């Protein structure tokens, strides 16, 4: 039940003499803990000062980062990463044990990491699913520090896009000794954050609306980092952000659909795939009716993704029919794993007749003629617009279906969904 997001932005031409890049954020950072963070804003900032095993190159391919080289077993189920000489910003060496600790934190039920499934369902790391379910200890996770510079990962089955997952923040390393000195304050200030990436955090506090990062002189690839630093500003009003760009206060700003029409012919306008999904998440564990497959199929076929992307977002976003969005992972041949969306459209593209057919089956199976659900949605402009159209589409196509909307700050919405305190989430 998703569609693919796209970043559209105005970008001033930068060069090595500019010093600091001034960037807009749409929302505050929710968490700087890589295993706890769930939102794109947090991931963007964490990735500015942290490197994982791999990174994405300009063509979207996975290339070495902290891992200098790697080997893949003949059966595709064992990955051995050989780490380069890299340092944390406190002078400690980045070791294989840092990755083991970070990954164990991700699957530890005590941490309730929303993206723990990246290791289990998506990454297929041995014993990840059992650990998340509380059936095995975190020490049974299929990741081993053979020595300080060698990390071995065991998978249940071959995963063709596994290397692409390595630049997702949930897979980032955490220095265990440093973490233990911070505990509950980890990731809340420059003093409780370590960098092993191109930049390091200089001033930040939770819910900050402006903060900076400076170039990390100890970064292994520092010679290739042209900027002296990054300056982030949280600007929630898109028109204010565009004005700040036009006056030179910002070097880069995101645009909404209406603004795209205004500036699309400007040579500084850029449109790039964001590699993320908008999706509707039904709480099938907490709401019995939503566990009914035919009801979920009815909802799926009642959604007109083309109308949402073309008439509401209007920013180049495209309908998506796969759980893995385009530009997110590569397949066995090195090409985009989800580039061809057309072959999946028949399973979930808009079809009012199919939606009504599945809806009637669901009503019979559940013994009900009508349904009322509540959907939580972020308090930002775009999510509210999308939610309103989703409500209209479902209520128009499915007679007797009511979708109420509850608007919450993103942090609260994320927490409610993590706690299972929701019916449907956007």
Where are these predicted regions, by residue range?
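N-terminal lobe/hinge region of extracytoplasmic solute-binding protein
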Residues: 24-74, 194
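Surface-exposed binding/hinge segments that line
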Residues: 98-100, 114-177
């Amino acid at each position: 039940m998703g569609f693919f997001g796209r970043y559209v932005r105005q970008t001033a031409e930068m060069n090595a003499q500019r010093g600091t890049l001034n960037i807009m954020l749409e929302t505050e950072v929710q968490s700087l803990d890589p295993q706890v963070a769930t939102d794109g804003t947090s991931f963007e900032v964490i990735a500015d000062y942290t490197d994982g095993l791999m990174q994405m190159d300009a063509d979207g391919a996975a290339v070495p980062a902290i891992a200098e080289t790697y080997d893949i077993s003949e059966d595709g189920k064992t990955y051995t990463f050989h780490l380069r000489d890299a340092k944390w910003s406190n002078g400690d060496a980045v070791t294989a044990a840092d990755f083991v600790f970070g990954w164990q934190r991700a699957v530890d039920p005590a941490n309730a990491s929303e993206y723990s499934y990246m290791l289990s369902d998506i990454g297929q790391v041995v014993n990840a699913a059992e650990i998340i379910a509380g059936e095995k200890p975190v020490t049974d996770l299929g990741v081993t520090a053979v020595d300080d510079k060698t990390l071995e990962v065991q998978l249940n089955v071959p995963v063709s896009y596994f290397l692409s997952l390595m630049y997702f923040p949930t897979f980032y390393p955490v220095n265990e000794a440093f973490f233990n000195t911070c505990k509950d304050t980890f990731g809340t200030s420059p003093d409780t954050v370590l960098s092993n990436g191109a930049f390091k955090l200089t001033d930040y506090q939770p819910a900050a609306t402006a903060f900076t990062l400076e170039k990390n002189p100890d970064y292994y690839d520092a010679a290739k980092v042209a900027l002296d630093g990054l300056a982030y500003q949280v600007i929630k009003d898109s028109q204010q952000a565009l004005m700040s760009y036009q006056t030179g206060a910002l070097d880069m700003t995101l645009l909404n659909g209406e603004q795209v029409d205004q500036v699309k012919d400007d040579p500084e306008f850029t449109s790039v795939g964001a590699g993320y999904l908008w999706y509707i998440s039904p709480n099938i564990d907490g709401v019995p009716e939503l566990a009914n497959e035919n009801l979920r199929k009815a909802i799926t076929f009642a959604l007109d993704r083309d109308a949402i992307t073309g008439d509401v977002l209007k920013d180049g976003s495209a309908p998506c029919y796969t759980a893995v969005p385009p530009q997110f992972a590569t397949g066995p041949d090195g090409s985009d794993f989800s580039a061809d969306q057309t072959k999946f459209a028949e399973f979930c593209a808009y079809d009012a007749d199919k939606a009504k057919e599945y809806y009637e089956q669901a009503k019979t199976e559940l013994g009900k003629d009508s349904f009322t659900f509540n959907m939580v949605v972020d308090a930002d402009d775009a999510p509210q617009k999308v939610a309103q159209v989703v409500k209209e589409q479902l209520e128009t196509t499915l007679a007797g279906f009511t979708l109420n909307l509850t608007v919450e700050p993103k942090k609260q919405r994320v927490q409610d969904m993590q706690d299972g305190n929701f019916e449907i989430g956007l």
